[in-house]
Amino acid sequence: MLFRSKEYALVGLDNGTAFIDISDPVNIVYLGKLPTHTSPSIWRDIKVYNNYAFIVSEAGGHGMQVFDLTRLRNVANPPQTFTEDAHYGQFGNAHNIVINEETGFAYAVGTSTFNGGAHFVNISNPLNPTAAGGYSGSGYTHDAQVIVYDGPDPDYQGQEIYFGSNENEVVIVNVTNKNNPQLIATINYGSVDYTHQSWLTEDRSFLLIGDELDENAFGFNTRTIVANVSDLDNPFYFFQYFGNIASIDHNGYVKGNRYYLANYSGGMRVIDISNIANQQMTEIGYFDTFPANDNVNFNGTWNVYPYFASGNIVISGEGGFTLVKSENFGLEDQSIQAFSMSPNPARDFVVLRSAQSPIYSVVAHNLLGQEVLNVNHFDQQERSEEH
């Protein structure tokens, strides 16, 4: 019996969104592209909720495209040109989109609505997204993270909290009540030039902040600012980490005790943050997508995605798409696993569970090697999926 899981990379292009099957990492398949809704733009952002991709762009009039990712499972003759399944047009251009998968809300930021602050969209029905208000009180947000709070501050347990990177500061906003979002606090730091993006540690005690333009403005090596946010009402600057090279930081994400940083000409840097509470961060690896230099310029890596169950990491940027894996993992195929059942033939029910990778198909053979079962469709409520 075999069971297989699928992983897809969704990569923003200047003229659309590319879909790549990376389930077999040494034999990837370009499945096709969803063209931009309007005109080309080098800025395009994609997030996923319940098997749907939500896509925004800085292109004028673009709005938010919705694409059903289950269509990728049976692409007969790749690459194909796809069409969107739904569209939301209550804003035009947007720099970014943030989704809280726990609540079913999307937050478009950097639009022409709500002073560039968060534009709330209810996506609980992905094919019929609806406007749900917004937050304009702190001006333009470039990027954000939104969570159902489960950190150390008892005052905000279970509430929906927004951490917005707002060019010259980070804002913390309670967005639980979409009709009345409330500013909780702001985070400031020295030598600010452009507060670009930030991400929480998994224990929610610290926020890692990237300033996109400080390396050029002040001559720093790559700098990451760390704020203590264990008390949301009273966050404070904690310390700053400087990398080994001069290149510009762009987006960074935490997985476990590692911080994966898109570092433009420096490629992707991997930083150990296991001792962050003692103001220590240590680079432990990197993959350089722009080997020509590590200068302060906008060449190289724009983004990284380290959250696949397989351990594969997607890097995207001016050089295109790159798929890498930690040297701690081998290249052997982990997506297909075979096992036997006793007795064979089996009777009654067989229950299959996967602790990490979702199960997409099951193939069963009898003792003669004949295929007796081939199932590739499962009730959505009986399994979870990750793209």
Predicted regions and their residues:
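Feature marking well-ordered beta-strand scaffolds used for ligand recognition
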Residues: M1-F329
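Single conserved hydrophobic/aromatic residue that forms the stacking wall/gate
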Residues: L2, E386-H387
